[in-house]
Every structure is written in structure tokens, then in C-alpha cells.
């Protein structure tokens, strides 16, 4: 795919993952707290990455090329998809429990943006791609920790209420 069209794959893939969350996760009885959205978003993203990796590896020209592709994608594409799933889940969870539409838009457009940047940069430099990916991992980790912190406060508040009687 020419590099000027490489961003389209990220837009399409993240739209598909977002659609899966909207159609299948939003109405689950088990989806009862914001952290669940991160879990489901990451699960959907890693499932997608698995299918995508099978396609790349099994459609390569030789066994040596398959190993090379699998190795590179294990350290770049899989973390990318996981991070995009965390970001999508974080903002979708905020949307689901607050109703603020801006969170819904962020849950779709931020992963699209990061995925498009990743795809575009892979056409130029693996080193720059890895640096962008490291920054993305840091961002996704900070969002996850923010939810974990909020959740621990909720748990402590519930424990306090239960201990009072």
C-alpha cells in the first residue's frame, strides 16, 4: 500500500473494533464498571491483531520471511493494538458511565489517530516507529493506572460504607 494511503488501514481497523464494542460489549450485564471497558477493548484489539498477524505470516513468500514478519509484528503491531484497545476502552468506559459524548468520540478517534501514525511511520523508519510505540505504551499505561486509582477509591469508599453499617 502506498505510504500516503497507509493511514486508511488504521481508520478501518479501529472503526471495526469500535463497532464491536458498541454492538457486543455495551449491553453486556458483566459490563458494570468503567475498568471493564479497558478489558473488553484490549481483548477485542488483541483478537484482531491475532487475525491480522495470521494473515501477514501465512501470506508471506517464505518461512524465513514469515519468521521475520512474526518477530517484528510481535514487538510492534501487537503492542500497538493492545494500546489502542486500552485507549478505546478507557474513553468508552468514561462515556458509558458518564454519558458525555466527547468521551465516545475520543474512544474512536484517538485510537484511529495513533494507529494511522504508526502505519504511516512504518513506511519510513522502524526506529521512529518503535519510539512512537514506546510513547503510546506510556500513554496507555497512564490511562490504565488512572482508572485503577479511581477504582481503588471506589472500593475503599464501598468498604467504608459497609463497615459503617
Predicted regions and their residues:
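Hydrophobic alpha-helical segments at protein termini of multi-pass membrane proteins
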Residues: 1-165
Amino acid at each position: 500500500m502506498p505510504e500516503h494511503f497507509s493511514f486508511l488501514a488504521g481508520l478501518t481497523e479501529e472503526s471495526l473494533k469500535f463497532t464491536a464494542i458498541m454492538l457486543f460489549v455495551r449491553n453486556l450485564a458483566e459490563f458494570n464498571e468503567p475498568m471493564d471497558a479497558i478489558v473488553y477493548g484490549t481483548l477485542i484489539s488483541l483478537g484482531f491483531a491475532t487475525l491480522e498477524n495470521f494473515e501477514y505470516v501465512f501470506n508471506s513468500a517464505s518461512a524465513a520471511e514469515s519468521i521475520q514478519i512474526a518477530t517484528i509484528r510481535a514487538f510492534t503491531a501487537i503492542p500497538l493494538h493492545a494500546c489502542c484497545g486500552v485507549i478505546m476502552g478507557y474513553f468508552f468506559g468514561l462515556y458509558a458511565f458518564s454519558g458525555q459524548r466527547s468521551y465516545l468520540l475520543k474512544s474512536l478517534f484517538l485510537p484511529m489517530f495513533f494507529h494511522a501514525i504508526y502505519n504511516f511511520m512504518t513506511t519510513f523508519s522502524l526506529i521512529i516507529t518503535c519510539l512512537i510505540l514506546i510513547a503510546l505504551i506510556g500513554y496507555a499505561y497512564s490511562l490504565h493506572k488512572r482508572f485503577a486509582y479511581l477504582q481503588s477509591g471506589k472500593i475503599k469508599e464501598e468498604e467504608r460504607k459497609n463497615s459503617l453499617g
